[in-house]
From Swiss-Prot:
Family that this chain belongs to: Belongs to the CbpM family.
Protein name per UniProt: Chaperone modulatory protein CbpM
Its job: Interacts with CbpA and inhibits both the DnaJ-like co-chaperone activity and the DNA binding activity of CbpA. Together with CbpA, modulates the activity of the DnaK chaperone system. Does not inhibit the co-chaperone activity of DnaJ.
Domain of life: Bacteria
Designated gene of the protein: cbpM
InterPro entries in UniProt: CbpM
């Protein structure tokens, strides 16, 4: 099964996500998403970046956060997810050593 990655130019990305170019520059500057550059040095974004921005927009709407606050919230949510997965794996390993009556 092949993985397909969709890429967007700046204009396409803004149209797809609903952010302005100014907001996109701020989002990139805060490290919320990272563009990759092709040979002609234009920013390109993948579908994962679009998902992150859509999640960020939901946070902005639901919590009335500014972009720096959203960057912090996304970082904390990602860290929480990583820690939950690590905890799940550790519990799985621990269960091998604990006998269940």
């Amino acid at each position: 099964m092949a993985n397909i990655t969709v890429t967007f130019t700046i204009t396409e990305f803004c149209l797809h996500t609903g952010v302005t170019e100014e907001e996109l520059n701020e989002i990139v500057g805060l490290g919320v998403i990272e563009p990759y550059e092709d040979d002609n040095a234009d920013w390109q974004f993948d579908d994962r970046a679009a998902s992150v921005v859509q999640r960020a927009l939901r946070l902005r709407e639901e919590l009335a956060l500014d972009w720096p606050g959203i960057a912090v919230a996304l970082t904390l949510l990602e860290e929480n997810s990583r820690l939950r997965e690590e905890n799940r794996l550790l519990l799985q390993r621990l269960s091998r050593f604990i006998s269940h009556p």
